[in-house]
Curated annotation (Swiss-Prot):
Subunit and partners: Heterodimer of a catalytic subunit (MsrP) and a heme-binding subunit (MsrQ).
InterPro entries hit by this protein: Fe3_Rdtase_TM_dom, MsrQ-like
Gene expressing this chain: msrQ
Natural source organism: Xanthomonas euvesicatoria pv. vesicatoria (strain 85-10)
Record-given protein name: Protein-methionine-sulfoxide reductase heme-binding subunit MsrQ
Entry's Gene Ontology cellular component terms: plasma membrane
Similarity comment: family membership: Belongs to the MsrQ family.
Origin superkingdom: Bacteria
Entry's localization field: Cell inner membrane
Cofactor: FMN; heme b
């Protein structure tokens, strides 16, 4: 037990380090650009910051969705311990993505966000995804699981429409080359398709078990 706990702690430390590495690199590059004389973030630093943070939010969302299939395929229940952490990193990067848009793109004129939401569909679905992520992040603790009981599981099924909205946000944002959003859409389709297949398989198994065997003639 102690060995397992130590291994899990070590693994979580590595996951934290890996999850924070992109934002640490981005912060360092932003500092270089801010000081002047660096093109570390390309010709349009604001667009690059928004792109990277949004991309990592989507990646962590998909990795979170991959935890359940991974557990079912490998039989390693320990991977479930990383799901909450990865989901919170998805919310973290999504929040940084939104903050970058509000502060760097809109330059603090936050009241414009409502106009942008109504005018640009990709912002509409992106903002909706972030709003739906918020209650999942807030209720991710053991305390909330005990309070909500069965409703906790129902609430956290919101991650499925959130995934769809996030991919749609990326797809609509890209003007020409849709290969990258198509890749993430394909990954999401596989992850959701796996869940549908497992549920249908479980129903068929239950139906077979509940069907009485045919009566033998006497």
């Amino acid at each position: 037990m102690a060995k397992t706990s130590t291994s899990v702690i070590a693994a979580k430390t590595l996951v934290h380090a890996a999850a924070l590495a992109p934002i640490a690199l981005l912060g360092w590059q932003f500092w270089q650009v801010w000081q002047g004389g660096s093109d570390a973030l390309g010709a349009d630093p604001v667009a690059e910051i928004e792109h990277r943070t949004g991309l990592w939010a989507l990646r962590f969302l998909l990795i979170t969705l991959a935890i359940t299939p991974l557990r079912q395929l490998t039989g390693q229940a320990v991977v479930i311990r990383f799901r909450r952490m990865l989901g919170l990193y998805a919310f973290f990067y999504a929040s940084v993505h939104l903050a970058a848009y509000l502060t760097l793109d809109l330059r603090g004129f936050w009241t414009q966000i409502f106009e942008e939401i109504l005018k640009r569909p990709y912002i509409t679905v992106g903002f909706a995804a972030w709003l739906l992520l918020m209650p999942l992040a807030i209720t991710s603790t053991q305390g909330w699981m005990r309070r909500l009981k069965r409703n906790w599981g129902r609430l956290h099924t919101l991650i499925y429409p959130i995934g769809l909205l996030a991919v749609l946000h990326f797809w609509w944002l890209v003007k020409s080359d849709i290969r990258e959003p198509a890749l993430y859409a394909g990954i999401l389709a596989v992850l959701l398709g796996w869940r549908v297949w497992k549920k249908l398989s479980a129903r068929r198994t239950t139906a077979r078990r509940s069907t009485p065997p045919p009566a033998t003639p006497r």
